[in-house]
From Swiss-Prot:
One of its GO terms (cellular component) is plasma membrane. It is a multi-pass membrane protein. Coiled coil: none annotated. The chain crosses the membrane at residues 5-22, 42-61, 66-88, 101-118, 122-139, 159-181. It is found in: Cell membrane. The keyword ATP-binding does not apply. This is Uncharacterized protein TP_0148. Keywords: Cell membrane, Membrane, Transmembrane, Transmembrane helix. The lineage of its organism: Bacteria, Pseudomonadati, Spirochaetota, Spirochaetia, Spirochaetales.
Amino acid sequence: MVTMVPPLFFVCALFFAEGIGLDRLCIAALSPRCTLFHTCRFLFLGGILITGNWVCIHYVYDPLALRFLTPLGVGASAFCLSTCSGKLSRTCTSHRAQSEWGLLYALVFYITYTALNLFEALVMWGVSCVGFLCFSTILRAIHQRITQGNGTAVEKTAALLLASMGFIALSLYGTDELWLFPIPAAGMRTRL
């Protein structure tokens, strides 16, 4: 079984090096209720996407030799599901983060190509959502500590800059670590 550390690093790299989904992360960090709501929503949406795309890959694309359509299928389903769920739920914030579908696309695409079976893909998705929850909580704690402190503007900015540098260093380390774990070839996958 593939180690569960790379999905967590991949989430970190997407957030803090590429900027994908960073506005969603900041919105989720506004309050504990928003953090939990967005994490559960993200877990549910991703579970649907991974299961649906896994079935499409193995029972539609592979038999018809259309595996090259996988990125288009993942992108279309992530965009549609994210847009529909955003129109249905308006809790926690009225501002809809536009990059949520990009974050969904990147994570689902990475997991469907890395995992060897559906169970492993869903476990990796759970680990990614735990990373989402952890980073939201850390951002909320940093924001509260900085805004409630009695320091000057320079001291508050320095603390935020230091925290951001730590996140970026962790994401770059995670991106380098990802190259150590080979992605299995399409023909070496196991069936459901």
